Design a protein with these regions (language model features):
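Hydrophobic alpha-helical membrane segments
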Residues: 1-249
């Protein structure tokens, strides 16, 4: 399995070209993106099983998103069943990837408990008031511990569903090659993360300015409309990352 090593400029191109792909096929890219989000939200709301079902479904449904983005790039118009394309792949192995991510994230949270006695977990669950921690310097250490565990898990998972379903890699190798590819391509991913951060700040500033100059309702309308563009753009960017790093399937 070969992973291309890309330059810094690809990080911004994934954002710009992702937006261009959405503009080319807004209906299809929006459908697969929001169907993915909606199904996972519904799965997570299931009593007792939701917190397990959603992570297991995540890699399976992500293949449907990638297939939809590939169809949009090729100019094809697939049916609505494309979101379930992952079930035509080795879906049991895909579910194992979801289990890996679930266990890895749980381990990251448990690791923070060893450092702060459950402070960060309490913030996440809403049992601790964030206002009471404004001057809490110890919050930095559990965050660093969480990042030290969660980042490698995310790197191993990032490309793994595509490597398994599109490039026919066993799930263990898919996790390894995903981590390897992310590590070798830290430069464009750094630019990608910084680009998204800058974009978020610029949009937040622009929306606040518009709300102050025109009408506060403008902010509400914009907050409703922006995800309709940004969410498909981000998913399209993920497809472009797979294509650029690993080449045509």
């Amino acid at each position: 399995m070969h992973a291309h090593i890309l330059g810094y400029s690809h990080g911004w191109r994934w954002i710009a070209d992702g937006f261009a792909l959405w503009r080319r096929a807004p209906a299809l890219t929006s459908y697969v993106s929001f169907a993915y989000v909606l199904i996972l939200l519904l799965a997570s709301s299931l009593p007792y099983l939701g917190q397990i079902a959603a992570p297991l479904l995540m890699p399976i449904l992500s293949i449907g998103v990638l297939e939809g983005m590939a169809a949009a790039e090729a100019g094809r118009r697939p049916g609505p069943e494309i979101i379930f394309a992952g079930f035509r792949a080795p879906w049991r192995s895909l579910a194992l990837l979801g289990a890996f991510q679930l266990v890895g994230n749980l381990f990251a949270v448990l690791a923070t408990v060893l450092v702060d006695g459950g402070l960060l977990l309490g913030l996440y669950r809403g049992t601790i008031d964030p206002a009471s921690l404004e001057s809490e310097p110890q919050l930095l250490w559990p965050l660093l511990v969480w990042l030290a565990v969660a980042l490698p898990v995310t790197m191993a998972y990032w490309f793994a569903p595509a490597l398994l379903a599109w490039y026919r890699q066993p799930w263990i190798k898919a996790l390894f090659f995903s981590f390897y590819a992310m590590l070798r391509n830290w430069r464009p991913f750094l630019v990608y993360a910084l680009g998204l951060t800058v974009l978020a700040f610029v949009l937040a500033f622009a929306l606040s300015l518009l709300a102050a100059l025109i009408h506060p309702y403008v902010l509400g309308i914009a907050l409703f409309l922006l995800p309709l563009v940004l969410v498909p753009t981000l998913f399209a960017g993920l497809y472009l990352q797979v294509r650029d790093v690993f080449g045509p399937r």
